[in-house]
């Protein structure tokens, strides 16, 4: 997670340093801010993973949308649900506009594949489970509290449905914004986000939704 967070932050910082606008002096060194933001994101990550997100279950989708809207708004984003037969997509836009700058649209998805609990090597596929490899190279469960302790082993892994595909990247994106704010940095490009609710079903309706909201989603890069 930290490697991707570093990439996201450095991309924004590089753009910010090349931008014409000036920023307030950083209040914390960037490496420390990135580490702090990554660590602070773990409780939210665990919370989001606890929400079932079966792509065919409209109630699952609505619960995830509610959580995600609150999380993006907490970072100052403006959000809007895009209607999609009871399983809306979520659009978010950072309101700070940079005159003359490019606009980047980030695509992620929050739905997941159906779960067969008996096929999982843990009690609950929706409960974040911390694991490490034992002497035989097998994954074994350890206390999740370790994730919130003073020392986190980079070789540990969090197992749960959609932990890497694709809820992890969403939480990393939010943590990257937290790190930027902690250093008084702002992206020098305009930021839009589209969160798909049906990627695991082949995104069968995203074309229709995108066409209906062409101007809202307009960007220079995806």
Where in the sequence are the language-model features?
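Boundary at the C-terminal end of the N-terminal hydrophobic targeting segment
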Residues: 16-22
